[in-house]
Amino acid sequence: MSSPIRRLFVNGFPSLYGGAGTELHHQIIVWRKMGVEVHLIPSWDYHGEPLYNEMVSLGVIMHAPADWSAVQPGDPVLGFCNAGFLNALPEIRRHTKRTVFINCMTWLFPREKEAMQKGEIAMFLYQNEAVRQEAMPVLRKLNGDPQVQFLTFRPYFHAESFPFIRERDEDFFGCGRISRQDADKFAANTLHIYGAFVSPVEKRGLFLGFDKRSEAKIGRPFDWIRIARNQREVSQQDFYRHSRIILQPTDTTCLLYTSPSP
């Protein structure tokens, strides 16, 4: 497994949950397997991050926050749904013109549109063709430069970190949701949905990613729903081990996932 790209830079730092941070984590794993030299330029101090030691063991090169001095002309610099990356584009482009934005959402950010107008983004990457076809025409109207590329890629998922769970406790029915704590990640009727569905055994909920912002949006969860602020309190693996079903209503869509049965 190899790559024609020998080194790349990413603005940000991976995390154990949350879409963009998790995607970056898994991509770094496969990039290093492919022999790519990976540089991280975070927006904050990263030494206390849960994945710091793993990044060291993988041989990832980490720079001081917002320090672009190591970037050379021709180096690709990526931002995974990162507002800080969009704001730093003028400085980044003083070092390289190979700027790549991966928008993990289904909408465009105002600063993303502005960057397109100014020609600050050389490539847009999307996880699926449907989102690309929706976003590309809107951005093309802002800047018709044919050199700006719009491509899709297949995100890497490190399945080894999530072994198949064949058996779960039969004494209760585990349900839950997992996301960052932002209010937009929660539908206002989340608790109504959780309270309304029935189970032949006791229900036990788990909300991984919950704080005062979440509570201000939906209210205080029922006593039978455990809340965890982030992955430092409950790991992704423990969340999926608990959950037979994931009910994830948000402001924009309602996703229903079920765990495979034995």
Question: PLM features: what roles do these ranges have?
Answer:
Residues 72, 232-244:
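Short acidic alpha-helix that forms the nucleotide-activated donor recognition element
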Residues 107, 120-164:
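Donor nucleotide-sugar binding/catalytic pocket of nucleotide-sugar-dependent glycosyltransferases
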Residues 241-255:
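Acidic donor-binding loop of glycosyltransferase active sites
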Residues 20-31, 192-193:
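Short amphipathic alpha-helix
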Residues 257-262:
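Conserved small/polar residues in nucleotide/adenosyl-binding loops
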Residues 12-23, 183-185:
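A short, glycine/small-residue-rich beta-strand->loop->alpha-helix junction that serves as a flexible
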Residues 9-11, 29, 42-123, 130:
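Extended catalytic core of nucleotide-activated donor transferases of GT-like folds
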